[in-house]
Structures are given as structure tokens and as C-alpha cells.
Amino acid sequence: MSKNNYTNHSNHLENHDSDNFSKTGYSNSRLDAHFVCTSNPKLSFDAMTIVGNLNKNSAKKLSDFMSLDPQIRLWDILQTKFKAKALQEKVYIEYDKVKADTWDRRNMRVEFNPNKLTHDEMLWLKHNIIDYMEDDGFTRLDLAFDFEDDLSDYYALSEKALKRTVFFGTTGKAETKYFGSRDSNRFIRIYNKKKERKENADVDVSAEHLWRVEIELKRDMVDYWNNCFNDLHILKPAWATLESLKEQAMVYLLLHEESKWGELHRNSRRKYKQIIQEISSIDLTDLMKSTLTDNEENLQKQINFWQRKFEFWK
């Protein structure tokens, strides 16, 4: 396959900041008396995996190029496979023809976080690596919504059955919440991004709070990235506002003991899910949906860029 000339698209990237997305307003009338304003999230793709096929000729050319380029570290090199990291370890590349033929899947995979790449690095990666692949497409996309608010008290409620795991910090507050299975097509993380940046990269975030809602989409779910959480509600239930002490106690129990949902009759589960939504001053997913809608065209252009439709985002 002939390679695309990327120089014509360089100008589209010059002033691009992948974290600089437009912000949207928000309103919610469920609980006017308890309404709490929250900041508008910043939205980006935080992780991407692109798979495709290398034909024999392209595999040879790419292997020769990678063995000479100083920006690439190669290992596990054989005639039908190799592994590599590129651009200061920010990109992982794997080619394995034998494994692909055995499992009837595409033979090359490229993994990276676009937020960590400069515009020159994006062009380099597309021109020198990804453009060699045929029949390429995404098998993973992570949507990241960053809120400058404390989300430790928020509760994720789904119309579907979701496994829920919560990790608490030394203060007793929740710091990381997982919803779903890591092996599933959709896995949701809500975590204290400010603390994560400090612990993993020793970076101090100036904002008082920075929390991330991250939706990891894999396999066929990547095609629904713009419609991937309609069943989800991220709520801050004001359980103490309920007039009935019995309902207060039950809602508090359900919010803190996930296993208790399984002990309820179907009608009772429906009842308490409805109550939790009604006593919540805000549903973050409403704000996430409006933010996603406002940024959908821009995000689609990013996808198109990696898939050879050179209509880069502004």
C-alpha cells in the first residue's frame, strides 16, 4: 500500500492542544432546592489501540526502518514478528504473523495515548508506522472526562447489572471506583486524577480537585463511542433529605453495601433506583452527554486522522 504524504496536514496540527476542548453549560431541575453547580468537564481520547495487517513487503520495509531509527527500541525480533516501543516509550508496537494466522486476527497492533504525543510525534507515528497497515481499525478507545470537582461521594447507577469495586484512601474517602469487568467491552473508572498525577508523575495539579471519569471501550463497543453510556447515571444522592427514616436507612445501605441490591425483589430494586435518582442534585452523565455532543465532530476528526481520512481537527 502506498504511503500518504503527511506534510500537507502539518499545518492542521501546529496549534492544536489535545486537551483544549470547548466547554458546555449545564442545567438540571430534579432537585432545585439541593442543586449544586459543578464544573464543565474537559473531554479527550486518553488511549487508543489500532490494529491492522502488514503484508510481507510492508513488514520487511517497516522492520528495516525500525531497526535503524533511533526513536525506536526493538526486541523479540524474528522474521515473522517483532515488538517495539517508540517516541520515548510512549508508543507500543507489536507484529506477530504466526499468532494472527492461528487466531484469525490482524497481525499488527499499535497502542498509545494521543494526549502524550506532540503534533510532530503524531505525524511521525502516522506516516512511519500506522500507514504501513492495511485493513486497520480501532479495537480500543478511552474517553476521559476531567472534572475539577470532588467526585468521591458520587455513585454510579446503571440500568444494567454492573460489578462495582471501590478503593478507599487513608482519609476514609473513596479514591478509585471501577464499574464493570476489565475484560468486558466497556469498563468504567472514576478516580482522583490529582492524586494519581502526584503519585505516578510527581506533578502538582493547581486545581483544588481533579477527578476523572474514564470509559474504556473495546472491540465492537468502539463503534459506539459517541453513544456508550446511555444506561449510566453518576449521581450524588442526598439520602438524608428523605422524610422516611426507613427509606433513609435503606438507601444508605444500598449506597455503601453493593451486595444488598441482590437481596431485593425486582420491584424494590426499581423503586430504590428511582428514589436515588430523584434525591440526587445532579447527574454527571447529563453533563457528559452534552459535552460529548458539543465535541463529537472534533473527536470524529481525530479518529479520521488516524484512519487516513485527512480532515484533521482544529
From Swiss-Prot:
Q: Which UniProt keywords apply?
A: DNA replication, Plasmid
Q: What residue spans carry the Polar residues bias annotation? A: 1-10
An example of a Pfam family matching this protein is: Rep_trans
**InterPro entries for the chain:** REP-like_C, RepD-like_N
Q: Which GO terms describe its biological process?
A: DNA replication
Q: Where is the composition biased (Basic and acidic residues)?
A: 11-20
Q: Where is this region: Disordered?
A: 1-21
Instruction: Give the superkingdom in one word.
Output: Bacteria
Q: Which family does it belong to?
A: Belongs to the plasmid replication initiation factor family.
Q: What is the protein's known function?
A: This protein is probably a specific topoisomerase involved in initiating replication. This protein is specifically required and may be rate-limiting for replication of the plasmid in vivo.
Q: What else is known?
A: The nicking site of REP proteins is sequence, but not plasmid, specific.
What's this protein's name? Replication initiation protein
- Source organism (scientific name): Staphylococcus aureus
